[in-house]
């Protein structure tokens, strides 16, 4: 099931008008004309079978009607609804009654669908609890069980229990989960760690990759590839031995490198770009180029204001979601306009650092298993990637890593993503020292480190600080001997989260940290979410290292 693409349905079959056809971008390699189906989910004993149809695929014009009418304030609500009967029967009924004078779309949806539950709204925190106690008591609230799956819903069944971030996010997310796991380990929840380890391995086995999240509409993309970091955590905490995951790591690597060998310089296919000197680097990608199910109306509106073919904009919006940084000045040609997004034209520093970690992990585990040829091959791949990153993504003049615009052949903006090479051990000590100086002068605040130094209104920019960036910066700088900076970031972040907790009795997705007065972070396509998985995980781990703030 490796590396299968999305099947492109015939527009005539879907009864959708196609007004415009755009030629293939000359930079993008089309390897063949063969249509391949998206991988079908496997059966899980005792649970109804999932399928790969997204709500947009399944409900066609009904889906577009609901999303364009905005009968729910959040575009994610309808894709997360579950049908009360066979979806085909619902679509047939809709087609029969939609033109009736008294047709009420909202009532039709309410009569035919179960609305998604917001579990965390039932939880009321105890103001007397310490931050540590609050987090430990939240794990059961954020846990979902396999039997929670409903037939024909967009939720993909998983074999074991899992943690969700909270709020509108009622499914597990790939890269979020790694940072959540840090806290689970600190809380002694090895039971949940084992469940999540099994779930992610199961997804790789059955989908060929780990999707963005366990929803059908997330199958066409992944997220930052942190499974190698998860495996390292499992090994360190005695949850699972690393050797058992070697094949899974190789499968994930094959997903990210699909098509690489067929590329010529200055050409790209899916996640891979062949650079002018022949080296290989990676970018974020999504196999679909349609509006995202969960942000359908927002994507349509963004494309309208772009002046570009809509399918290009949709692809870049989807690739931005795959990056985990949705959205940020990192992906914008004009930092004031989301419509200028060009995610697929950037070589991201964090993605290539995570893939360096993946290559290194495969080499290290292969060595443990005595597979010398595989070890040598992947050590060479990791070394080649490090060299390519240093050639294209290292700004020697300013002493920082930056993303690289491979279409324009120039360095892009500086952001906190630059700390990931330190976290995975890809930088040398001189680079780490110079980067530390840049972070101190450009990103460090009394509340932690900013996502970027640009104010754009996007959530992964100034004035916001995010838990995963703090963790990777803390550990990354300490790994290279800069305990002073690492400890300063840690204590600043703990102070931010604790001060907000004492006032609001909750942890949230992101924090406004630009001026030393912690408050709710803003920006983005949806209201601020509380819960919150990865904030809980990072803070719980930091409490274990530094004590209660």
Curated annotation (Swiss-Prot):
Induction: Weakly induced by high osmolarity but not by trehalose. Expression is partially dependent on RpoS.
The reaction(s) this protein catalyses: alpha,alpha-trehalose + H2O = alpha-D-glucose + beta-D-glucose
Gene Ontology BP annotations: cellular hyperosmotic response; trehalose catabolic process
Variation of activity with pH: Optimum pH is 6.0.
Binding residue positions for substrate: 168, 175-176, 212, 221-223, 292-294, 324, 525
Protein's pathway: Glycan degradation; trehalose degradation; D-glucose from alpha,alpha-trehalose: step 1/1
Keywords on record: Cytoplasm, Glycosidase, Hydrolase
Family: Belongs to the glycosyl hydrolase 37 family.
Protein's name according to its UniProt entry: Cytoplasmic trehalase
UniProt source species: Escherichia coli (strain K12)
Gene this protein is translated from: treF
């Amino acid at each position: 099931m490796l590396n299968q693409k999305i099947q492109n349905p015939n527009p005539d079959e879907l009864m959708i008008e196609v007004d415009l056809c755009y030629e293939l971008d000359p930079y993008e390699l089309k390897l063949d004309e063969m249509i391949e189906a998206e991988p079908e989910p496997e059966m899980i004993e005792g649970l109804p079978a999932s399928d790969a149809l997204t709500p947009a695929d399944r409900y066609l014009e009904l889906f577009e009607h609901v999303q364009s009418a905005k009968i729910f304030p959040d575009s994610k609500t309808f894709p997360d609804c579950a049908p009360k009967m066979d979806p085909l029967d619902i679509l047939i009924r809709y087609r029969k009654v939609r033109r009736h004078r008294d047709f009420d779309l909202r009532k039709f949806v309410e009569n035919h669908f179960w609305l998604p539950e917001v579990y965390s709204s039932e939880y009321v925190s105890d103001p007397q609890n310490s931050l540590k106690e609050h987090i430990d008591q939240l794990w059961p609230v954020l846990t979902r069980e396999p039997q929670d799956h409903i037939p024909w819903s967009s939720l993909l069944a998983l074999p074991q229990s899992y943690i969700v971030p909270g709020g509108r996010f009622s499914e597990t997310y790939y890269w979020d989960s790694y940072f959540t796991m840090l806290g689970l380990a600190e809380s002694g929840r090895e039971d949940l760690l084992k469940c999540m380890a099994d779930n992610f391995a199961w997804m790789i086995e059955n989908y060929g990759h780990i999707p963005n999240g366990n929803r059908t509409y997330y199958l066409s993309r992944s997220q930052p590839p942190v499974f190698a970091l998860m495996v390292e955590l499992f090994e360190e905490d005695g949850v699972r031995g690393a050797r058992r995951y070697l094949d899974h790591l190789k499968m994930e690597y094959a997903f990210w490198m699909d098509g690489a060998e067929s590329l010529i310089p200055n050409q790209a296919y899916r996640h891979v770009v062949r650079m002018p000197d022949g080296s290989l680097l990676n970018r974020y990608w999504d196999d679909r180029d349609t509006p995202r199910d969960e942000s359908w109306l927002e994507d349509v509106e963004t494309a309208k204001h772009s002046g570009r073919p809509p399918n290009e904009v949709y692809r870049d919006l989807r690739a931005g979601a795959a990056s985990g940084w949705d959205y940020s000045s990192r992906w914008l040609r004009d930092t004031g306009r989301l419509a200028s997004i060009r995610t697929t034209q950037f070589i991201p520093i964090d993605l290539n650092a995570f893939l360096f970690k993946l290559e290194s992990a495969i080499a290290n585990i292969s060595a443990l298993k005595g597979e010398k040829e595989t070890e040598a091959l992947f050590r060479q791949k990791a070394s080649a990637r490090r060299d390519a990153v240093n050639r294209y993504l290292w700004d020697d003049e300013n002493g920082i890593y930056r993303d690289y615009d491979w279409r324009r052949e120039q360095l892009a903006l500086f952001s906190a993503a630059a700390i990931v090479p330190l976290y995975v051990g890809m930088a040398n000590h001189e680079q780490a020292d110079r980067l530390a100086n840049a972070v101190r002068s450009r990103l460090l605040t009394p509340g932690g480190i900013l996502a970027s130094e640009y104010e754009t209104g996007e959530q992964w920019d100034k004035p916001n600080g995010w838990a995963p960036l703090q963790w990777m910066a803390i550990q990354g700088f300490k790994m290279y001997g800069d305990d002073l900076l690492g400890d300063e970031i840690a204590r600043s972040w703990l102070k931010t989260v604790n001060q907000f907790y004492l006032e609001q009795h909750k942890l949230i997705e992101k924090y406004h940290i630009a001026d030393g007065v912690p408050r709710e972070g803003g920006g983005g396509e949806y209201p601020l979410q509380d819960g919150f998985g990865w904030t809980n995980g990072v803070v719980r781990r930091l409490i274990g290292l530094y004590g209660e703030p």
